[in-house]
Amino acid sequence: MEDFVRQCFNPMIVELAEKTMKEYGENPKIETNKFAAICTHMEVCFMYSDFHFINERGESIIVEPGDSNALLKHRFEIIEGRDRNVAWTVVNSICNTTGVGKPKFLPDLYDYKEDRFIEIGVTRREVHVYYLEKANKIKSEETHIHIFSFTGEEMATKADYTLDEESRARIKTRLFTIRQEMASRGLWDSFVSPREAKRQLKKDLRSQGQCEGLPTKVSHQTSPVLKTLEPMWMDSSRMATLRASFPKCLEK
């Protein structure tokens, strides 16, 4: 799984995920499923904000790569992936500037058009189950929740999906690609099932002669940036085009 993560994700995302795990005492080389989960969540957050700007009339517009955006304001402030202290500084600054209530937990993004924080989730389970867990934890009507699954399902607060359909399709396609690449390497089942993941972890450590003295029980402490993962969909009419925008993972 570690090799898969390093081959299939942008090096910047991998570096941020490693830094986050180490901040919480987690080892990317041991808790490889969590490593993959964090990288996936970070990439979804970055894709969520990609190409979205606000023009001089306050309208949300999409600017494709290569087009001029020098005079435009980014629609989304990315909070996910920042150092914890820096992230809270950004949140406090946004709250002081906009008057929006301060969230209890660090959100992932801030939407300058809708003036709201956004919590992104990526789940391997039913989207409505994970959505309710998020809502019960956050307990704030001011933070907008948007959940994606690997099955192509999504759920958002008040059915407000924030982004246009094509932007969301890009995210779903990327999740589909990740799932397919994992499956082709025999990694998907252990990624979905915690029990299988634990069994695989012990097997890997044993094969490396590292079992003694090393923890084989996966930590249940959850990093704020870690959102659970799972299964996927794709509209066949645009799958080839959208999927081509992502580099194919290298075979081992």
UniProtKB/Swiss-Prot annotation:
Q: Which UniProt keywords apply?
A: Decay of host mRNAs by virus, Eukaryotic host gene expression shutoff by virus, Host cytoplasm, Host gene expression shutoff by virus, Host mRNA suppression by virus, Host nucleus, Host-virus interaction
Indicate where this protein resides in the cell.
Host cytoplasm; Host nucleus
Domain notes per entry:
The probable endonuclease active site in the N-terminus and the basic amino acid cluster in the C-terminus are important for the shutoff activity. The C-terminus acts as a nuclear localization signal. The C-terminus is recruited to host protein complexes involved in nuclear Pol II RNA processing.
Pfam families, per the entry: Flu_PA
- This protein is called what? Protein PA-X
Q: Name one GO biological process term.
A: viral RNA genome replication
Q: Which organism is it from?
A: Influenza A virus (strain A/Swine/Wisconsin/1/1961 H1N1)
GO MF entry, a single one = RNA binding
Where is the secretion signal located?
none
List site positions: Important for efficient shutoff activity and nuclear localization.
195, 198-199
* InterPro entries referenced in this protein's UniProt entry, alphabetically: PA/PA-X, PA/PA-X_sf
Q: Which residues form the active site?
A: 80, 108
The disulfide bonds in this chain are none
Query: From which residue to which does any coiled coil extend?
Result: none
Similarity comment text for this entry: Belongs to the influenza viruses PA-X family.
Site feature (Important for efficient shutoff activity) residues = 202-203
In terms of superkingdom, the source organism counts as: Viruses
Q: Output the Gene3D superfamilies linked to this UniProt entry.
A: Influenza RNA-dependent RNA polymerase subunit PA, endonuclease domain
